[in-house]
Curated annotation (Swiss-Prot):
Protein name: Aspartate--tRNA ligase
Segments crossing the lipid bilayer: none
Tree of life domain: Bacteria
Class of enzymatic activity (EC top level): ligase
One Gene Ontology cellular component annotation held by this UniProt entry: cytoplasm
Annotated localization: Cytoplasm
């Protein structure tokens, strides 16, 4: 037998037992007549002692080096009281080695486990990076999450059904990864961006509770929390309303937090998209940050200051204030840095006002814009934002979107910089009632979620007549500023689906070509259905306390969508390309 126990599982209950351990040398210390090693496996680390009492094992241990793969047979003994290590889970015991077997020696590692290695090094030698205890713990947590989800889904009557990986390209927002067909030369499969249409078809097939933990693929520009291939917890239901779907999914996430880290998330508040954007400048607000945006256009619309009065009198403009309690200590240099920061989001500047004495009216205000205000305007502003002595007010004034984006980002930055964001808290919520459509860069209407989301209380005729007023029957789950899941009630009326396609500029010929199978299926007694998808990678990232999504994926890609370890992507064999009838054009 190669193993009877895991290293990290040993404790006082094992004292006196003979055990067989298999793992790696984490650290070695030679104290003359004795040799100690820390031995590591996926469960943790235990100290092993080599004593002259077992001379063969002691002699063999002299040749051990870090990362040798070994087997130890020995007895679990109590550490002397003065040698107990309270920083180790196994710190009350050690193993007295009786036999040592070296499975395999190790070259000097290209990574130093005791130093900060570059991410490039870590990804190139990922199989070594995963030996680090913190990385092993993250993947164990990920496995625990998926195990919990499967149990929950099974207990709640959901069926785990697989959907195809080789499918048809459909416009879902990002670019598809294409797979050429050898049999059908010149044609391509697409790797799925999500199982969206297949899970809707399963509802039409009568499987009223479906789930799947599934790989999805998107060929898009990457950020720190994005990967070209990622994993979704995909869910769809029939005959449930949006609140009922949210209730089930909230129970799942509530239970997941309790099971994984012992945290009770409490009841999730529900907030409309409009309120989230108005108060926090984001559709995924981080409620750990106490700062809020307050609209003041009605107060400043008549001031002799174009920066304020123009957007205040423009239906598409916005003037908003963030009050920072005790922020008057912020220096002019810091204010200049914040002004530069909001410029990234298109803001032309950042007005500010320090409240040196709230009881002194305008006389108590230090601000370059004070000369444009009068006592009534200042009184209105101070009352609206509840200004106090020692505060600073930051003003954003521009088009609605620019002000909202810039001030929303400033709110987050102020929260971090000033230590206002309560990092020890968990703040979940649901965001609902998103706009059905938004304008893209060319000014055309695009679906804010996807084109299969149902509008709320709109007929097809009303939707076609006034699409920009429509509210989507959609919902996102947000935790600490991260969107961890999103879903909607789906369109189940063929006329409504065709109307949405037309609004999005997809004519009847394109509808038949791209979605003919869906439009046909909608004709045959389609049930009302709704669903949701969680990002497993992002959930794991939150539950393990890392800010890098690559830390919770065993073999991730870089931000350039490359695998440094296997050197993928690579050039294809010319013979394989010939069989596929593909010629490669040299990139310019």
């Amino acid at each position: 037998m190669m193993r009877t126990h895991y290293c990290g599982a040993l404790n006082r209950n094992n004292i006196g037992q003979d055990v067989t351990l298999s793992g790696w040398v984490h650290r070695r210390r030679d104290l003359g007549g004795l040799i100690f090693i820390d031995m590591r496996d996926r469960d943790g680390i235990v100290q092993v002692c080599f004593d002259p009492k077992y001379q063969d094992a002691l002699t063999a241990a002299a040749g051990l080096r870090n990362e040798f793969c070994i087997q130890i047979k020995g007895e679990v003994i109590a550490r002397p009281d003065n040698q107990i290590n309270k920083n180790m889970a196994t710190g009350e015991v050690e193993v007295l080695a009786k036999e040592l077997r070296i499975y395999n020696a190790s070259d000097v590692l290209p990574l130093d486990f005791n130093q900060n290695n570059t991410e490039e090094q870590r990804l190139k030698y990922r199989y070594l990076d995963l030996r680090r205890p913190e990385m092993a713990q993250r993947l164990k947590t990920r496995a625990k999450i998926t195990s919990f989800v499967r149990r929950f889904m099974d207990d709640n009557g959901f069926l785990d059904i697989e959907t195809p990986m080789l499918t048809k390209a459909t416009p879902e927002g990002a670019r598809d990864y294409l797979v050429p067909s050898r049999v059908h030369k010149g044609k391509f499969y697409a790797l799925p961006q999500s199982p969206q249409l297949f899970k809707q078809l399963l509802m039409m097939s009568g499987f009223d509770r479906y789930y799947q933990i599934v790989k999805c693929f998107r060929d898009e520009d990457l950020r720190a929390d994005r990967q070209p291939e990622f994993t979704q917890i995909d869910v769809e239901t029939s005959f449930l309303t949006a609140p009922e779907v949210r209730e089930i999914m909230e129970r799942m996430v509530h239970g997941l937090w309790l099971d994984t880290i012992g945290v009770d998330l409490g009841k999730f508040p529900v907030m409309t998209w409009q309120e989230a954007m108005r108060r926090f400048g984001s559709d995924k607000p981080d409620l750990r940050n106490p700062l809020e945006m307050v609209d003041v256009a009605d107060i400043v619309k008549d001031v002799e200051f174009k920066v304020f009065n123009e957007p205040a009198n423009n239906p598409n403009g916005r003037v908003a204030v963030i009050r920072v309690p005790n922020g008057a200590e912020i220096t002019r240099k810091q204010i200049d840095e914040y002004t530069q920061f909001v410029g990234i989001y298109g803001a032309k500047g950042l007005a500010w006002a320090k409240v040196n004495d709230i009881n002194a009216g305008l006389e108590g205000v230090q601000s370059p814009i004070a000369k444009f205000l009068n006592e009534d305007v200042w009184k209105g502003l101070a009352e609206r934002v509840n200004a106090q002595t020692g505060d600073i007010l930051f003003f954003g004034a521009d088009k609605w979107q620019t002000t909202t984006d810039a001030m929303g980002a400033l709110r987050l930055k102020l929260g971090r910089d000033l230590g206002l964001t309560r990092l020890d808290e968990w703040q979940p919520l649901w965001v609902i009632d998103f706009p059905m459509f938004e304008r893209d860069e060319e000014g055309n209407l695009a679906a804010m979620h996807h084109p299969f989301t149902s509008p709320k209380d709109f007929s097809p005729e009303q939707l076609e007549a006034d699409p920009t007023s429509a509210v989507a029957n959609a919902y996102d789950m947000v935790i600490n500023g991260y969107e961890v899941g999103g879903g909607s009630v789906r369109i189940f009326d063929p006329k409504m689906q065709q109307t949405v396609f037309r609004i999005l500029g997809i004519d009847e010929e394109q509808q038949r070509e791209k979605f003919g199978f869906l439009l046909d299926a909608l004709k045959f007694g389609t049930p009302p259905h709704a669903g949701l998808a969680f990002g497993l990678d992002r959930l794991t990232m939150l539950l393990t306390g890392t800010e890098n999504i690559r830390d919770v994926i065993a073999f991730p890609k870089t931000t350039a969508a490359a695998c440094l370890m296997t050197e993928a992507p690579s050039f294809a064999n010319p013979q394989a390309l010939e069989e596929l009838a593909i010629s490669v054009v040299k990139a310019e």
